[in-house]
Amino acid sequence: GYFPSVGAAWVISEEDFMKDQKFFDYLKLRASWGRLGNDHVAASDGFASITTGNSASGVFGNSTFPGYQNTTYFSYLKWELVDETNVGLNFSTFKNRLNVDLDYFYRLTKRAVISPRLPFSNDVLAGNYGKILNSGFDLSLNWNDNIGRDFKYNLGVNLSYLKNKVKDLGGLSSIKGGKTINMVGKEMNSYYGYKVVGVYQTLEECAEDPIAVANNLVPGDFKYEDVNGDNVIDGDDRQVLGSYIP
């Protein structure tokens, strides 16, 4: 594959117009863009062979005969592509005692491998259908100083923020996977289930709630959110509950 990259940096503190200022001891602005390829993709995941039929698919006269049909699917898996843009700022101040590094990143994964279910089947077929966005920043603060001649110390703080979002699923709005879901506009592999909104406290409360009555719930049982308001807790009431990303 072809994976180009480019980067540039500007040490602003060395410019003539910065010579008279007293705040920055060092100031640098940098930016880069690059494309990466992920080849950790199992080619066999892009192949599926589905057999349908049963032992009595055909009838001839008074006899039944087995009949099966085999359908083969190919998705022709390719490498995932990752386009990443980084913008950073480095500066030192207070006679180089305070050093600050700030980085912003925008990482877009194209041709991400996802595995939707095949039509009329429980089998899945991996393909380059997805587009995933990761963006955020990293901040590092370091203070270096000394007390007297013999005691030196360093204090550091690191902060990070990451936002993950599914941008595209090959035309699908979501792909469910048991307790997780990939949904356009949400975080990758979000937790998916029923939201607990309380606990039934008394028999009277249970008797007045049609959901509790229908499911023989008693005080101490969880109360789940009825998302569509139909007084029935079923699969239509499952929702995104959060993400494994802190």
Where are these regions (language model features)?
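Conserved C-terminal beta-signal and adjacent last beta-strands/turns
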Residues: N154, I245-P246
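Extracellular/periplasmic, surface-exposed regions of secreted and cell-surface proteins
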Residues: G1-G193
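Flexible glycine-rich, low-complexity coil/linker segments exposed to the extracellular/periplasmic environment
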Residues: N54-N70, N182-Y244
